[in-house]
Structures are given as C-alpha cells and as structure tokens.
C-alpha cells in the first residue's frame, strides 16, 4: 500500500520538532549550574562544604544515640588512660627541699594531691603559684620526675626582728615578713627595729647597725620615729637621735667621737644629731645632780 504523502506544513513541523530535540544547548538550570561552577567561591564551597556536611550529619546521627555516645566515650577514656597511666608518668610522693620545718609544714598543707597521680593530671603552675604566695618564699621550683613531685624552695632569710603591735616579726632585707617569733630571745642574733614604717626602711637600718657595730652589745634597737627618722637605743638608757636626712653620716660622727673621746661612755642620756649644724648633748639626771652639788657651783650660787 502506498503511503499517504503528508502535507507540506506537517512535514515542516516534524522537521522543526526533530531539530528542537537535537538542540545541543543546555537547559536553563544546567546553564545556571555551569555558571555557578565557574565561580571560585561556589566551587570551593561545593568541594569542601559537601564532605563537611556529610560528616556532620553522620556525627549527629551517631552521637544522637546515648548508647553510641557511651561506647565512643568509653573507648576514648580507655585510650587516654592507657597512655597517661603508664608507670613512667605516675607520681607517688612529693619531697620538699630548702625550706625550714615550719615552712615545709605550711607547704605540705598546700599539696592537696591524691597520690598516686599521673603527671598529665598535675597542675604544676597552680601549685607553684600557691606556694610562691607564702611570704617566707622568695622563689620556688616545682617539677615532677622519677615518680616524685620535687618542690625546691629558696626561702627568704630574716635580717632583723620588727617589734610591731601584733608581735615580733622576722623581716628580710627587702622589708618582707618571713614569719613571727614569740620571744625576742628566740632570735637574739638578729638586730631589733621598732616603730611604724620601720619595715620600709630596713636597708638604711641595716647600714646603721653596721656602723654601730663597734658599740657591740650596747646596741639594743633602732626605733623609727614618725616614719621619717631613726633613734638608736643603747643600754644605760642612752639614745642617739639621728636626722631624717643623711643619718648614716651623723652616726659615723657619733662613733668617731666615742672612739676619740668616749662620748657614749660618759653620763650622757641623749645625743641629738637632728640639727646638722649643732650637736646637742643632754646629760643624765645623776650627772646634773652631781654637777649642782659641786662646791664651786654652790659658792657661786651663794
């Protein structure tokens, strides 16, 4: 049977339809996607963001279940313990060196550590800070090794005893209290200072004690007066009043007079050096009475 010829219009439509089907141009969405992939930021986001999102979703699904979380944390803690609890990392005791018995006892109270313990669980910096806060401690070194927590102390050395309202304090050369004593006889080898503000002028006080060393045991104390100057207190109730400025030079002159004229060996109660231009000496009551009772004095008075 002979096929029926299509009309020219139908043949034209059929050709256009076949042409459209073979059109190599991309679709609208494909075109937009290709344009976006030409953008570096979008391309990097797709390349990096997609794996991150997939991993995040997987983690969320796994950790969203309590039994999965417990299983993972159990294995994690076991792995950590297998490393940190090894014998070479364990500390079983502590040792304190360089500290006096009283200071060592105070440090022991700060070492609140449940031994044995892993070095990974030790907060050495916190322990070092707490020990360094103790006033007698000048420097501290804390380190763990060989199964022992080693605490090495550099203790402040007292150079004087400060008599204050709350008792007798031991002071170092920087004016920092290192401890307290009950009686002066507990540290007789240390010089005695007293008065408000004496601890702030300890370097000057130690220099004055050095200059007064020729007087030996006659030196009893240095008393700070008005937080600005010193009085040197000697036995026999003698006092050397020093100026607020250049007290060292003033005391040197007094010591020179003692060596040349035995000034402090006489019946002198007070040597006033506060006025640099004029030295004033006040005699004892006994010396004044003896002076008044002299025959020449009585005759002159009559």
From Swiss-Prot:
Q: Does the keyword Electron transport apply?
A: no
One GO cellular component term of this record is:
cell division site
Membrane topology value: Single-pass type II membrane protein
The UniProt keywords, alphabetically, are: Cell cycle, Cell division, Cell inner membrane, Cell membrane, Membrane, Transmembrane, Transmembrane helix
- Gene3D superfamilies cross-referenced by the UniProt entry: Cell division protein FtsQ/DivIB (3.40.50.11690)
Residues in the Periplasmic compartment per record: 65-302
Which parts of the chain span the membrane according to its record?
44-64
**InterPro entries per the record?**
Cell_div_FtsQ/DivIB_C (IPR005548), FtsQ (IPR026579), FtsQ_C_sf (IPR045335), POTRA (IPR034746)
Signal sequence, start to end? none
> Which ranges does the record list as Cytoplasmic topological domains?
1-43
Domain POTRA residues, every copy = 89-156
**What main location does UniProt list?**
membrane
> Which GO BP terms, alphabetically?
cell septum assembly; FtsZ-dependent cytokinesis
Hey, which family's this protein in? Belongs to the FtsQ/DivIB family. FtsQ subfamily.
Concerning HAMAP family, the annotation shows:
FtsQ_subfam (MF_00911)
Could you identify this protein by its name?
A: Cell division protein FtsQ
The record's gene field reads ftsQ
